[in-house]
Amino acid sequence: SLRLMLRDPLAFVWRYALGWRAVPEDDQPLTLDARSYGELVHELLKRTVDALEPVPGYARASREEIEAALATSTETVRTHWPLKRSAPPALLWKHTLAAAAQLALKALTLDETFQPGTRSWTELAFSQAGDGAMAHDLPWRPDSLVTIPGTQVRIRGNIDRLDLTGDRRGVRVSDYKTGVEPRRAEEIVLGRGAELQRVIYSVAASQLLP
């Protein structure tokens, strides 16, 4: 840091006074890998649901309202994603984003309508140390501990989406997946561990909601 201050005072101010960092420049991909694509879809889902809450409310929103919120979220992600992450060239990025938006719309309109007064939250954390200050307007504190029933083993995570009825008697947890839909998906209970995540989500909801 002293060497930088002597050689380039302006760069020293940028880095240590303003906290600026250069964005890593990766090779521009032609496509997003599976993980990045999943994160892209999750980002669209989160922004859309958050935009609909608390008014009119995701669970009460019409398809037109969902589509409008998704369109706004898609445009925001279109401009912000390439500033922080690697993205394909412009034309391919446009098609990638359109495909991700279609997948997000399917996920957002798949579930049946819940009761009036239902609230929805996305990326809802549990057992996350140090997140207690972020508990405003959430159904529980993000640092609230969750354990496997009958043990002292703690589990933590983030619920993709939680819908809670106004009387707090009805709860729905959603775990978004962007991979290929398995055969006879309606018959899968634990799916050799692949569905275990939803079980953990349910345990968290049952312990943290009074």
Which role fits each region the language model picked out?
Residues 9-22, 74-80, 169-180:
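Active-site-adjacent bridging/hinge elements
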Residues 1, 207-210:
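Short, intrinsically disordered, charge-balanced linker/junction segments flanking boundaries
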Residues 1-47:
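C-terminal, charged and often intrinsically disordered regions of DNA end-processing helicases
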Residues 124-208:
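Non-catalytic protein-protein interaction segments used by genome-maintenance enzymes to assemble
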Residues 10, 33, 37, 41, ...:
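Hydrophobic (often cysteine-bearing) scaffold residues that line and stabilize catalytic clefts
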Residues 43-137:
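A non-catalytic, helix-rich entry segment at domain boundaries
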Residues 1, 19-31, 52-61, 81-94, ...:
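Glycine- and acidic
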